[in-house]
């Protein structure tokens, strides 16, 4: 496959080699030969080992754990490509770390998502491609074209294959995620409910209030990120207590840090479905009730359209 103005080069960082290889296979292209390694003092060294002059280069790199290492890899790969005369550089970020720091959380705190966007731009990236940003307005943090892909079509197909939609309800695990959950509920034509967590008084435990009648329904919790898993597990408990038949969860990015996998395994969640935007840990891979939806085909299609100067948004029309 060739780009409209030059050949396509796919360069993989170390964040998710399996996903990078699957994307390359989907495009029927090899990964560009490159070395991304550490010196003894843990400084990062990058060497592009083939000619990329005039190419349309795509760096495949999630800024997931360890986020700072993977971010630095991205920046240094970008610099290497820029100094090797790549015509255009697109950063393909299946998971954009620091996205949850998209506003000041208190006095004298940073907006780290904006800082990271600036770093990526200043390093020499011409375009960004990412998946299910934590907040849509983060697209505006970049001063370069940014395509935010959506995992919803993949989830919709999986849900339609698996569930009786007449007995299914989509659930937002918090008030902030209502728009995302409503969008999915509309796509599969099911009702919507909300789990509202709040503290009645300072120092008291959070109370989970279910807004909507979930009795007898198979409930599907929808969100963009699952990290510790605490909110998800507590929401599942609240839904079961209100008479839900079963509780499933469809979450785009499985950060699943610390003991999250064990927490999910021992919870009332029937199944957690995540994408492979983040390389799963051994604990996540072995968890009996965590399943992965592959996103390589979606990203491959988006890369092909970008290289051919075709519409990416039409993938989701």
Curated annotation (Swiss-Prot):
Residue pairs linked by disulfide bridges in the UniProt entry: none
Query: Which Gene Ontology biological process is one annotated for this entry?
Result: ribonucleoside monophosphate biosynthetic process
Q: Which residues bind Mg(2+) 2?
A: 174
Q: Which top-level group of life is the source organism from? A: Bacteria
Q: Does the keyword Magnesium apply?
A: yes
| Record key words, sorted | ATP-binding, Cytoplasm, Kinase, Magnesium, Metal-binding, Nucleotide biosynthesis, Nucleotide-binding, Transferase
Record bears the keyword Metal-binding = yes
UniProt cofactor note: Binds 2 Mg(2+) ions per subunit.
Cellular-component GO terms for this entry: cytoplasm; ribose phosphate diphosphokinase complex
InterPro entries on file = PRib_PP_synth_CS (IPR000842), Pribosyltran_N (IPR029099), PRibTrfase_dom (IPR000836), PRTase-like (IPR029057), Rib-P_diPkinase (IPR005946), Rib-P_diPkinase_bac (IPR037515)
Major subcellular location class: cytoplasm
Residues annotated for ATP binding in this entry = 41-43, 100-101
**Residues reported to bind Mg(2+) 1:** 134
Give binding positions for D-ribose 5-phosphate: 199, 223, 227-231
The role this protein plays is:
Involved in the biosynthesis of the central metabolite phospho-alpha-D-ribosyl-1-pyrophosphate (PRPP) via the transfer of pyrophosphoryl group from ATP to 1-hydroxyl of ribose-5-phosphate (Rib-5-P).
What is this protein identified as? Answer: Ribose-phosphate pyrophosphokinase
Organism (species): Bradyrhizobium diazoefficiens (strain JCM 10833 / BCRC 13528 / IAM 13628 / NBRC 14792 / USDA 110)
Its ancestry begins with:
Bacteria, Pseudomonadati, Pseudomonadota, Alphaproteobacteria, Hyphomicrobiales
């Amino acid at each position: 496959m060739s780009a409209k103005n030059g050949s396509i080069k796919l360069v993989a960082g170390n964040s998710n080699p399996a996903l990078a290889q699957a994307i390359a296979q989907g495009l029927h292209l090899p990964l560009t030969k490159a070395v991304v390694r550490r010196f003894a003092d843990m400084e990062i060294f990058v060497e592009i080992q083939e000619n990329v002059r005039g190419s349309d280069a795509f760096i495949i790199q999630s800024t997931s754990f360890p986020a700072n290492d993977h971010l630095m890899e991205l920046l240094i790969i970008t610099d290497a490509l820029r100094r090797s005369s790549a015509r255009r550089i697109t950063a393909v970020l299946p998971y954009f770390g620091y996205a949850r720091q998209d506003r000041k959380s208190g006095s004298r705190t940073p907006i780290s998502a904006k800082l990271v966007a600036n770093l990526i731009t200043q390093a020499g990236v011409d375009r960004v491609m990412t998946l299910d940003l934590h907040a849509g307005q983060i697209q505006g943090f970049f001063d370069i074209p940014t395509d935010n892909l959506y995992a919803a079509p993949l989830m919709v197909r999986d849900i339609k294959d698996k569930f009786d939609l007449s007995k299914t309800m989509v659930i937002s695990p918090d008030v902030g995620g209502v728009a995302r959950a409503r969008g999915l509920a509309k796509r599969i034509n099911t009702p919507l409910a909300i789990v509202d967590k709040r503290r009645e008084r300072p120092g008291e435990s959070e109370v989970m209030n279910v807004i909507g009648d979930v009795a007898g329904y198979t409930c599907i919790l929808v969100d963009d990120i699952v990290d510790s898993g605490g909110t998800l597990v507590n929401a599942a408990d609240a839904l079961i207590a209100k008479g839900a038949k079963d509780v499933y969860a469809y979450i785009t990015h499985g950060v699943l840090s610390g003991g999250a996998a064990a927490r999910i395994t021992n919870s009332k969640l029937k199944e957690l479905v995540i994408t492979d935007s983040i390389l799963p840990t051994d604990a996540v891979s072995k968890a009996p009730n965590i399943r992965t939806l592959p996103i390589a085909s979606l990203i491959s299609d988006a890369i092909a359209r970008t290289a051919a100067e075709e519409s990416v948004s039409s993938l989701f029309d």
